[in-house]
Amino acid sequence: MNIKEAKNEIKHTVQAYLNKDYLGDYRIPPLRQRPILLIGPPGIGKTQIMEQIARECKIALVSYNITHHTRQSAVGLPFIRETSYGGETYSVTEYTMSEIIASIYRRMEETGLDEGILFVDEINCVSETLAPTMLQFLQGKMFGNQKIPEGWIIVAAGNPPEYNKSVREFDMVTLDRVRRIDVEADYGVWKEYARERKLHGALLSYLELRPNNFYRVEADVDGLQYVTARGWEDLSQLIYAYEELSIPVTEEVIYEFLHHRDVAEDVEAYLSLYHKYQDDYGIPEILAGNVRTEVYARLFQAGFDERLSVVGLLADGLRGILEKVILQKNKTDQWYDYLRQYQHTLKEGTDKTPAEDYRQMLETIAEENAQLEKTGLVDRKELSRREILRQQMAENAPSAAEPREAFAQAKQGFDNCRSILAAQEQAGEQAMEAAFDFMENAFGNGQEMILFVTELTLMSEAVQFLAQHPCERYLQYNQELLIGTRRRELLDELNQ
């Protein structure tokens, strides 16, 4: 299965394992909660889906790469203790708590979450001295003489032997005690993730043209050449940073991430073209409705790769505009909820002044943000946005003693926030219409239009925006696309 299917399967398993009956006992006893063994190529996102599942299920996550551990850190250190058996005193060996299990209890204390996932990566690549410990871990859910706490689900991951020479195959006795899930690299599924993570538009456009270069592992006379999903994501971050600093992205830099000489050379050439198209076509001008005449003339003569790149640039530019709208709307909605809460407090009345009530609310928000940071249930960007909102609310703290006047003072910042949102929504609507004007004039209802509409359909920012601000032409072309796709499917069925 692909990584998206694996994520859903693991998430469903977590929900099933943590489901309790009316007595508060787990419906599936811990003894029958088989560990999950995830086997797949390196760099396809096994660790990332664990983080996503933990956030979505609102549980804790402890993640370990077991190859970084010795037997002592996994099992614990030995110590001698005196004990009596049958009236005789003996010296026996016991062990301190495993570092891994200790980290689970530490995580529980930090987050206040009693349930979670223990994710152990590269479990089939451990040293010979640690191999028996890993078998005991999978078979008995123990490290040394300590059991994994109840409510904690074991997910282990490893690579197939063709990707790692250090791999040790598990025997049937062990495999019969786990749920093995085999995962393969899938560009279509990864593309959805890449859009959500805002990977660089040049890389996404390149992979639309060269999907076979998404994941490659080859051995030749120069050694192993490889390209992984992780490489594309890390390269994207570097390109953004280099562009901000006006540093050129060379073939050698790309090769450090995409360790395949032909692919690195091809990506470098495409990046140069992509930036040239950015300058030549003037995407911001197109989205503002100001298209130069020579742009259409050039497109009519352009090859398919260039036309496809322009569509990608247009979609990427539109995404940037719509993302600002969505973020501003989320901020406005959150601010509105806090104001409703403050208004309710003022109506109910307390023994504090309106200013003190407002400060109390801000302190509660700060505590909530701190708790979210501890639990890791939201990412850093969301935490940063929450903190910025709290600071802006603090700047609009009321000073009036009369509740009605105090609320009016607190509401001033919100009114400004709402005005900014209205302006951005209008800009988003205009950019959407300008984009369709350009697409119709340049490509009609050709395959480029199909690609553009498909990009919008898969773009989370566009989906959220269009739900609030419908665009007639998007609905028209999307309906035509759905009808055309269904018609082809029916014809294929009849031909069979």
Feature locations, PLM:
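Charged/polar, solvent-exposed surface patches and flexible loops
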Residues: 8, 12, 16, 55, ...
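Arginine residue identity/basic-tract feature
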Residues: 27, 32-34, 55, 71, ...
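Phenylalanine-focused residue identity feature
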Residues: 79, 90, 95, 119, ...
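Alpha-helical lid/collar subdomain of P-loop NTPases
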Residues: 196-352
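AAA+ P-loop NTPase catalytic core and its hallmark functional loops
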Residues: 1-212, 217-220
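Terminal-proximal interaction/regulatory segments of ATP-powered molecular machines
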Residues: 300-496
